[in-house]
């Protein structure tokens, strides 16, 4: 079973449970945008392919994306909490060689960013 559900937009409401400071979420928009920009490149590549199975090069990029998420998590506790609560490492691992899985992951990341923007008073 995939970590990211069919209703990934509803699942993205996990943002509501992130730790907050006095003026908004501990996770900054910049920190989230770093993770989102890493996924955007993969989204573009996956969309160009009609094959339901990811090519080796793209699977390697998904694995490298996991490394980058781990690295960013190690740099900032707010990112680590976000990655854990949103189950992003598990979701990346669950992609395997599925093109649809990668596209769903990328859309989930976009949904997370959208909810952060919507809910964070600093972004208004």
From Swiss-Prot:
One of its GO terms (biological process) is defense response to virus. Disruption phenotype: Deletion of the entire CRISPR-Cas locus (cas6 to cas2, Rv2824c to Rv2816c) decreases resistance to plasmids encoding spacer elements about 6-fold. The keyword RNA-binding applies. GO terms for molecular function: RNA binding. Keywords: Antiviral defense, RNA-binding. Belongs to the CRISPR-associated Csm2 family. Part of the Csm effector complex that includes Cas10, Csm2, Csm3, Csm4 and Csm5. Encoded in a type III-A CRISPR locus. CRISPR (clustered regularly interspaced short palindromic repeat) is an adaptive immune system that provides protection against mobile genetic elements (viruses, transposable elements and conjugative plasmids). CRISPR clusters contain spacers, sequences complementary to antecedent mobile elements, and target invading nucleic acids. CRISPR clusters are transcribed and processed into CRISPR RNA (crRNA). This subunit may be involved in monitoring complementarity of crRNA and target RNA. This is CRISPR system Cms protein Csm2. It comes from Mycobacterium tuberculosis (strain ATCC 25618 / H37Rv).
């Amino acid at each position: 079973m995939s970590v990211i559900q069919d209703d990934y937009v509803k699942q993205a409401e996990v943002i509501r449970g992130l730790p907050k400071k006095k003026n908004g979420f501990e996770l900054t928009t910049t920190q989230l945008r770093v993770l989102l920009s890493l996924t955007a490149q993969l989204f573009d590549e996956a969309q160009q392919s009609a094959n339901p199975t990811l090519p080796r090069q793209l699977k390697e990029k998904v694995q490298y994306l996991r490394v980058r998420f781990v690295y960013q998590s190690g740099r900032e506790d707010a990112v680590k909490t976000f990655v854990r609560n949103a189950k992003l490492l598990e979701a990346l691992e669950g992609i395997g060689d599925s093109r649809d899985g990668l596209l769903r992951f990328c859309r989930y990341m976009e949904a997370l960013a959208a909810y952060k923007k919507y809910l964070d008073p600093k972004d208004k």
